[in-house]
Amino acid sequence: MPARLREIVAVLKQLGIVVEEPKKGSHFMVRREGVRPYPLSGHNGLKSEISDKYIRGLCAHFGLDVDTFKKLL
């Protein structure tokens, strides 16, 4: 199920993962020490809707369980 970027950012912060707002453009950078950055497109800012495909990719990139992540949303 898709989720708002605002909700995703809140969960990532709970998990100790840093989310940087874009200085230019529309991509938020998700960072965790020891892992390369992961860009998340937020064309409408924090109210952007992020598809299930990108949520699964984000979880896979950071080694998070998708079902557990979705329960936190």
Give residue ranges: language-model regions.
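Basic nucleic-acid-binding interfaces
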Residues: 1-24, 29-73
